[in-house]
Every structure is written in C-alpha cells, then in structure tokens.
C-alpha cells in the first residue's frame, strides 16, 4: 500500500495490508480512511487487496480498478459495484486535484495495471509486480519526478526458498515480478 498526497487529494494505491494497519498508518499522518479521495488497485492478488473488503465495508471510498481485476474481486467484495469506477489501460481521469493515468503491466493477474499521478508540476509513477516493462508503461513513466519501483525479486532466494515448485516456476516466468537486474542503474535515466 502506498499513499500519494498532493493539494488535498489523498490516493491509496493498493490495500495489501490489513484495514487496521492502513487506518493506523493514515492516523500517523493525521488522516482517516474517510479522507481518502480514492483507492487505486493494480490487480486482485491478496498482497495488493488484503485490507480492501474491511476498508470498503466501513468507508464508501471510490475504487478504481480494471474490469479484469473487478471480475476477480467481486466474490470477495459485496460492496464492489457501489464504489467501483472502472478504468482501462491507456485511460486517464481526474481525482480531486490529481490526474491519474493507467497503464498495463505484465503480471499473472486478471488485468494488471499501474498508475501515474500528476498534480500541478509534479508526477509520481508506480510500477509493481511486472515481469518486464511494457512500452506503454515506459511511455507513461517517462519524465516522472518520483518513480516507485518494486524491486524485491531475488532469484537465488526464490529457488532455495520454501515455495512449492509450481509457484517458483510461475514467479520465474516472464509475467512474474520484475527483477532488480532488469532495470539497471544506467537504464533509469530513460524513465526520469
């Protein structure tokens, strides 16, 4: 979970921790879930949606997600249809003082996306859980002031870790998480 705040607009990107932890983290910033302008969901996997059901049960927050993600979330979120604002890769929409751009990622999920958030002269790009950086993602992230890039993939740790063989193969596949070796230091200039 990540909070992007600017000019009175507070966007929660994913809700991968419990609703209680989200509330505690927001409280440290002087915020409550009712202060959130929206929740942006990248995909349906539990590590991105664990706190979503409880959060939405008590707080009617607009939820932006793709149709593919909504399809998989619907059985777990009875209130989904009342708060869902469907988005699609390549779309852009305003939330408060921010302009949000949606771009596709490569992940083994229903319809995985990530986001660029522009507000005034500043731009933040978020890129998580992608097996590689698709061209539309690279284009959307070009020129951002801050790039939040998940880079916790370690092939040796994965191979020697406790996961079942089938999960290891899935993660090691092209649509698994991006490895820090795929975006080397000298390549970052092309995105910033």
Describe each region flagged by the PLM.
Residues 1-29, 113-128, 146:
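Conserved beta-strand hairpin/beta-sheet module of binuclear metal-dependent hydrolase folds
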Residues 13-16, 37-44, 66, 125-128, ...:
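Active-site neighborhood of phospho(di)ester-bond hydrolases with catalytic His/Asp-centered motifs
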Residues 17-19, 46, 131-132, 153:
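Short, glycine/acidic-enriched loop or turn micro-motifs at the edges of active sites
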Residues 19-65:
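Active-site metal-binding motif and surrounding structural segment of the metallo-beta-lactamase
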Residues 36, 81, 144-145:
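Short, well-ordered alpha-helix to beta-strand connector turns
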Residues 100-176:
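Active-site-proximal loop/helix segment associated with metal-binding centers of metalloenzymes
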Residues 181-188:
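Conserved small/polar residues in nucleotide/adenosyl-binding loops
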